[in-house]
């Protein structure tokens, strides 16, 4: 029926199924309930853990890269969101993040009027009108309208 009764209180996105809603909420909560027994790395979705487990070298990579990641994460982040306290390295990142709280959607589709908080989301959406699928999987050749869909798909190979 197209009904989407589950609404995210953080960003306003709607979902048809509770499972989709729960998975989405992990973006905001940072919850990662699935963990690798070998290296302890945590994942927000079971399929990410399964992908990780199918690539054993990733565990060693993770352990060696952990120090690099920690140093990367220690980069100064002087721009703080007054709503939730999240910090950013650039003021433009903070500004973009704050749209989640304000609901500001300054990028509108000329075709249907649907509005988006970011330019990239609008560009992805516009591909649904044109039918253009500019993102191609190098493994199997399957094409996608959105880069995120391609990235998600590539995890199955």
Swiss-Prot record:
Q: Which domain of life is it from?
A: Eukaryota
Q: Cross-referenced InterPro entries, in alphabetical order?
A: Znf_C2H2_sf, Znf_C2H2_type
Organism, by scientific name, is Xenopus laevis
Subcellular localization is given as: Nucleus
Q: Which GO terms describe its molecular function?
A: DNA-binding transcription factor activity, RNA polymerase II-specific; RNA polymerase II cis-regulatory region sequence-specific DNA binding; zinc ion binding
Instruction: Report the PROSITE patterns cross-referenced here.
Output: ZINC_FINGER_C2H2_1, ZINC_FINGER_C2H2_2
Zinc finger annotations (C2H2-type) as residue ranges: 6-28, 34-56, 79-101, 107-129, 135-157
* Record's protein name: Oocyte zinc finger protein XlCOF2
Give the record's GO CC terms. Answer: chromatin; PcG protein complex; transcription regulator complex
Q: Which cysteines are joined by disulfide bonds?
A: none
Gene3D superfamilies, per the entry: Classic Zinc Finger
